[in-house]
Amino acid sequence: MALKSPAFRRKFPLLVTGGLLALQPLATSYVVAAEQFDCQVSAAGGWDCKPKTPVNNLPPRPVHEGAAVSSGTEAAGEAETADRPVLVTEAKGRGLKSRSEDYSHLDWVPREKLTAAQLAETGPYCGGAYIEPTRPGMADTTPKDESPTYINAKVSKYQQEQQVATLAGDVVMRQGSMQAEADEANLYQAENRGELKGNVKIRDNGSLVVGDEAQIQLDTGEAQVDNAEYVMHKSHIRGSALYAKRGENAIIRLKDGTYTTCEPGSNAWQLKGNNITLNPATGFGTATNVTLRVKDFPVFYTPYIYFPIDDRRQSGFLPPSFSTSSDTGFMLVTPYYFNLAPNYDATLYPRYMAKRGLLMEGEFRYLTPSSEGQFGGAYLNDKNDDRKDQTDYKDQRWMVNWQHKGGLDERLMTEVDYTDISDPFYFQDLESDQIGVESRDFLNQQGALTYRGDSYTARLNVHAYEAATISQITPYDRLPQITLNGVLPYQPGGLNFAYETEAARFERDLKNDTVFDKDGNLDLTAGPDGRRLDENIQGIERANGTRLNVAPSISYPMTASYGFLTPKLKYAYTQYDLDLDSKGKADAIALQTANPDAYGSYDSSVSRDVPIFSVDSGLYFDRNTSLFGNNYRQTLEPRMFYLYVPYKDQKDIPLFDTGETLFSYDSLFRDNRFSGTDRIGDENKLSLGVTTRWIEDNGFERQNFSIGQAYYFKDRKVQLPGIDYRTRKDAQSDVSPYALVYNYYFNRDWRFNSDFNWDPDSRSTRSGSAMFHYQPEDNPNKIVNLGYRYRNDTIAYDSTTGTWKVGGGDYGTPGDPNYIKDYYKIQQHDFSVIWPIVPQWNVIARWQHDYNRNRTLEAMGGFEYDNCCWKLRLINRYWIDYDDFSQALPQNEKGDHGVFLQIVLKGLGGVVGNKVESFLDQGIQGYREREDQAY
């Protein structure tokens, strides 16, 4: 129990515990034990203590090692030199072993002594962790000026005239959450000040400061520790200083201090600065005149640095990054983060590029109870003139971006994804540090409003595209698109009534000017006389128009525990109002005359109505079985799907948003082989399939296998523009390819996924893939991916000829300089691995090869060193880069090579090599999961 001092004596609230009474004026100057007295607050505000029992003489005060001896002799001088404490500056960034061989004075606990819970929070390559010992008052949040002070010691002496108490032997003082420990202490009552000597430790809320001597202000908690070492347990941070000052607000200031996240026995890296400030309240630190030292060797200097000491956000400079490339030359990025409020922030990315100048980029992020999003922008006055003569290039380069998701209420949702750029080469020449901004051929400029009712969904969508390439044709914009889809809220007689409705306006502004390459010459690679690729679009495919589609349906689902049967009737009606330019009208007449079976004619108003009838059915069987000594429940799930869609001539309808889907097991049970609304495939087929699964008692699905085939009773006449079904063997075949899917999960770490489609007519593989993935759940550092894919039935639009290509397809036509046979055919393997070879060393590799064109798409190899406080990656990489210097896709495919170095100082962030993260994340499956769980 502790006694609190009277209000007018609060300035020095020392309390008596079961240890020693320190500050009561005593009649004698010799040492007495606190247990021998009963103490009460006197009327004068002091302590009134009376002995319980007679006082016995206590043994003399012990003499501690390192105590001062009389000077004046050589022996005394030698002893003084020998007993001089080792300075922290002599440790060169390591912990002082003179204080403890095992660094236990820093609360360091070796890995083998950690509990299971502590190991789970410790990095796999860390030799231990800083564990704060449990002590009284750790969670005390009482303000210092209201907290009593508890003191324990073995012996004490009080000098009444000087009002000085001397404590010796395991001295412990505690006030609130703060605790001070020492071998000896002098407490000055009049000044509320204490002097601590020998093995000094000051603890407070996850921090520890260790030193030889300390001055402490007892009423505020301010302290100065000489020859200090410090630890911040949760952040794995330690360091040292000639002296460390702890303020009343718990801020730690270090003179000639160091900062590192390395283990006590390692000096792999450290920050060394004249003045270092660590603020646990904000989670950040600052330092001036700072050198970054590796193995105590200075490698980098900055007059000022602002760095995190935990995972909280705070305004300040983020770690800079620098790199070099042929496009930019030397590049330096010095991000500055603005922590404006808990729910919004901003980041500025000044990017200096030796070949291009200074690019200013920034982003603003926000979060509200019902929405989230970000604004971003960038600007560069580009001084590089490599593209100055190329069409569409602008030297005043900019980018703006807005991403938003939110809800105006629980039913009404809003969405914005808008990016605009100055020229189509922006992302090819420049990078972006903004989160969520991706480089792609066409950038979204989309806004949507969605309302979700109880049985329906209504959506207003405006979706345009901004071209980030000149090697693709201009796509259609939806300006706007309105949809209403739902079901009737009641089911009379068990019937389900559903509906799909859409009204959309499709527009695009086709370009018809000439194109010049970067040398100022006409680009003859993809069009006649240097014309745009848009000039290759022919006939009614050049039309703009409005589309109205209504598709009500009625179904009668019958379900039971052993199976299901669902007949369904759907009626699709579509109305088009079209506009076509003069070139399109002339092309349409010529094409329709030359090949009336593949091309249609132009009509400003076109309609189409198609009934769709289907019957979907399936059964469910299961049994208990065993496999390789394990018990399973095996299922057998046969499925039969009949589809009838009569033929409707649709050659007069342009393609606004429609393509043909690739064949797979799932496609056997779809009611349309086309995506989008502009084509509804005629069908009279019966699809048969069966799936079997092996399920363990705990619900884990060990493996599954599916096989199926469709039987056709009529040829499929509806095709994409320019394709005559009589030239496609697969459109006239009586059966589809066999579709197989097999997945095996060895456990939760290993999995194998495959699909295989075999054509019985040609007795050849139509498509297939196999992918093996290994990543242990308890050790995600190990990754192995091995895959192969083959596809000989791709369907693609060739922008150089303005025609659709099926069955692989060539690029261009024979005789053209850019002609490539089977350009769209896919035959590739992909292998990637991240694997530990010895402790802390991992090998990283990837090889992606295109057998169709006998070329390597990407190859990289290197190593990673990872320990408790820093990480290094060195990777040699070759890849196919795409840079639009012409309109012909193959001409823009250039092999590139680079050696990439990444250094991460844990606790500071990446120093160099941030680009390494992006290509590892995109190229190696499982890499992101690995990094998310990394220490």
Swiss-Prot record:
What does the UniProt keyword field contain?
Cell outer membrane, Membrane, Signal
Question: In the UniProt record, does the keyword rRNA processing occur?
Answer: no
GO annotation (BP), single: lipopolysaccharide transport
Q: What does the entry list under GO cellular component?
A: cell outer membrane; transporter complex
What is the superkingdom listed in this entry's lineage?
A: Bacteria
Q: Where in the cell is it found?
A: Cell outer membrane
Q: Where is the composition biased (Low complexity)?
A: 65-79
Positions of the UniProt region annotated as Disordered: 52-85
Query: What InterPro entries would the database entry show?
Result: LipoPS_assembly_LptD (IPR020889), LptD (IPR050218), LptD_C (IPR007543), OstA-like_N (IPR005653)
Signal peptide positions (record) = 1-33
Quaternary structure (record): Component of the lipopolysaccharide transport and assembly complex. Interacts with LptE and LptA.
**Purpose of the protein:** Together with LptE, is involved in the assembly of lipopolysaccharide (LPS) at the surface of the outer membrane.
What's the family?
Belongs to the LptD family.
PANTHER family in alphabetical order = LPS-ASSEMBLY PROTEIN, LPS-ASSEMBLY PROTEIN LPTD
Q: Per its record, how is this protein called by name?
A: LPS-assembly protein LptD
Q: Which organism is it from?
A: Pseudomonas putida (strain ATCC 700007 / DSM 6899 / JCM 31910 / BCRC 17059 / LMG 24140 / F1)
